C-alpha cells in the first residue's frame, strides 16, 4: 500500500480577526439556544420542586382534617349510643313528655 506523504514544512497563515469573529458569530445562535434551553430546564425543575412541596403541605393538611373528622365521628357514635339506651329513653318519656307505664285498667287485650 502506498502511503500519502504529508508535508509539514508549510506553516498555516494566521487567521485574520474578521475571520475569527465570523466564526464566533456562527456559534453564537447555538450557544444562545443551549443557554435558553438550560434556563428553561432549570426553571421547570425549580417549579416542579415548589409544586411538590406545596402538594406535600396540602396532603398533610388533608390528613389532619381526616383525623379531626374521624375523631368527631367516633364522638358522635358514642353520643348516639348513649342516647339510645333504654334507661335514658324511659327517663325522657317520663320527665319531659309526661308519659307513664300503663295501669292494668288501661291495657286492652285484643283476641
UniProtKB/Swiss-Prot annotation:
Q: Which family does it belong to?
A: Belongs to the FtsL family.
Q: Which parts of the sequence lie on the Cytoplasmic side of the lipid bilayer?
A: 1-26
Record topological domains on the Periplasmic side: 48-111
Q: What is the protein named?
A: Cell division protein FtsL
GO biological process assignments: cell division
Q: Which UniProt keywords apply?
A: Cell cycle, Cell division, Cell inner membrane, Cell membrane, Coiled coil, Membrane, Transmembrane, Transmembrane helix
Q: Which residues form a coiled coil?
A: 51-85
Q: Entry's InterPro entries?
A: Cell_div_FtsL (IPR011922), FtsL/DivIC (IPR007060)
Where is it located? Cell inner membrane
Identify its membrane topology class: Single-pass type II membrane protein
Q: Where are the transmembrane segments?
A: 27-47
**Matching HAMAP family, A to Z?**
FtsL
Source organism superkingdom: Bacteria
| One Gene Ontology term, aspect cellular component | plasma membrane
* Role played: Essential cell division protein.
